[in-house]
């Protein structure tokens, strides 16, 4: 059943010649049941501010607007703007379109004077999804400018985001996510839901910021985790050699023969707080 009276997405794509560009990490989401499910996962968004990154032809955008959200859409691909403007006509005063590279966008300033924090809800372009997430996780000050994030990633990336210590997917991204937020995989999305269909399954991840994460410099924790996971199979005394190696680990009370994937987030925080 249509969620609005706008033309079907396939028709929109044909009208505006919006073939997905691999160089932009684009995979357009066509399944209206799934776009509505993503919007629903973010909670009650009626009358609430929402940031969407990479709306493309506007499939998820329409689902967000249909649920009453006030959407700010960041789209780098100028080809998509006319299609998004057609949606804006259908939802006056509800959709703001910004043509910009999301990696260059200062998101915190978009809602500086707003009484409510926005929710970030997006089918992120595959080629910038991880970097965008890191930018939002390491944002200062904390608590951040957003209330929550409901984001689609490649399944493997989603597993890395939510992984626990001692697991195959546990790494730097897991630590930085778990330090400042609570993240869970909400549901998977099959390849056939997209045009073009990717070769892998995707997953929607719901992320809620912690109000009081363990005290630590984001910059230092980012650096320590990057160094510790640099060569996964090596012991920490080797990987952390440039940061003090055995001396640093002894101060932290951590066995020098352990590997990075065995450390709890709190232990990484201890290491980061000891780094000068």
From Swiss-Prot:
GO cellular component: cytosol
Gene3D superfamilies, alphabetized: Ribosomal RNA adenine dimethylase-like, domain 2, Vaccinia Virus protein VP39
InterPro entries found in the cross-reference section: KsgA/Erm (IPR001737), rRNA_Ade_diMease-like_C (IPR023165), rRNA_Ade_Mease_Trfase_CS (IPR020596), rRNA_Ade_methylase_Trfase_N (IPR020598), rRNA_adenine_dimethylase (IPR011530), SAM-dependent_MTases_sf (IPR029063)
Enzyme class: transferase
CDD domains in UniProt: AdoMet_MTases
Keywords associated with the record: Cytoplasm, Methyltransferase, RNA-binding, rRNA processing, S-adenosyl-L-methionine, Transferase
Localization terms from the record: Cytoplasm
Binding of S-adenosyl-L-methionine, residues: 27, 29, 54, 75, 101, 123
Catalytic activity annotation: adenosine(1518)/adenosine(1519) in 16S rRNA + 4 S-adenosyl-L-methionine = N(6)-dimethyladenosine(1518)/N(6)-dimethyladenosine(1519) in 16S rRNA + 4 S-adenosyl-L-homocysteine + 4 H(+)
Enzyme Commission designation: 2.1.1.182
Entries under Pfam families matching the protein: RrnaAD
GO molecular function: 16S rRNA (adenine(1518)-N(6)/adenine(1519)-N(6))-dimethyltransferase activity; RNA binding
Family: Belongs to the class I-like SAM-binding methyltransferase superfamily. rRNA adenine N(6)-methyltransferase family. RsmA subfamily.
Function recorded in the entry: Specifically dimethylates two adjacent adenosines (A1518 and A1519) in the loop of a conserved hairpin near the 3'-end of 16S rRNA in the 30S particle. May play a critical role in biogenesis of 30S subunits.
The name this protein goes by in its record: Ribosomal RNA small subunit methyltransferase A
Species of provenance: Bartonella henselae (strain ATCC 49882 / DSM 28221 / CCUG 30454 / Houston 1) (Rochalimaea henselae)
Gene: rsmA
């Amino acid at each position: 059943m249509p969620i609005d009276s706008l033309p079907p997405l396939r028709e929109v794509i044909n009208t505006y010649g919006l073939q997905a560009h691999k160089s932009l990490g684009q995979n357009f989401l066509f399944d209206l049941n799934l776009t509505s499910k993503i919007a629903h996962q973010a909670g009650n968004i009626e009358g609430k501010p929402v940031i969407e990154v990479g709306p493309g032809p506007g499939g998820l955008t329409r689902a967000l607007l249909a649920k009453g959200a006030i959407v700010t859409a960041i789209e780098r691909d100028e080809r998509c703007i006319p299609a998004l403007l057609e949606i804006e006509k259908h939802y006056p005063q509800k959709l703001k379109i910004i043509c910009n590279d999301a990696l260059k966008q200062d998101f915190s300033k978009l809602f500086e004077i707003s009484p409510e924090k926005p929710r970030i809800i997006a089918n992120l372009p595959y080629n910038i999804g991880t970097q965008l997430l890191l930018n939002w996780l390491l944002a200062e000050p904390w608590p951040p400018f957003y209330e929550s994030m409901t984001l689609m990633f490649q399944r493997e990336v989603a597993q890395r985001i939510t992984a626990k210590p001692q697991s195959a997917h546990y790494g730097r991204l897991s630590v930085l996510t778990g330090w400042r937020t609570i993240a869970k995989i909400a549901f998977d999305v099959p390849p056939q839901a997209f045009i073009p269909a990717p070769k892998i399954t995707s997953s929607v991840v719901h992320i809620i910021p912690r109000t009081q994460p363990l005290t630590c410099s984001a910059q230092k924790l980012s650096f320590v985790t990057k160094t510790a996971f640099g060569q996964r199979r090596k012991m920490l005394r080797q990987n952390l050699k440039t940061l003090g190696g055995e001396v640093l680990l002894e101060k932290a009370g951590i066995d020098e023969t352990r590997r990075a994937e065995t450390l709890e987030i709190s232990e990484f925080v201890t290491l980061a707080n000891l780094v000068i």
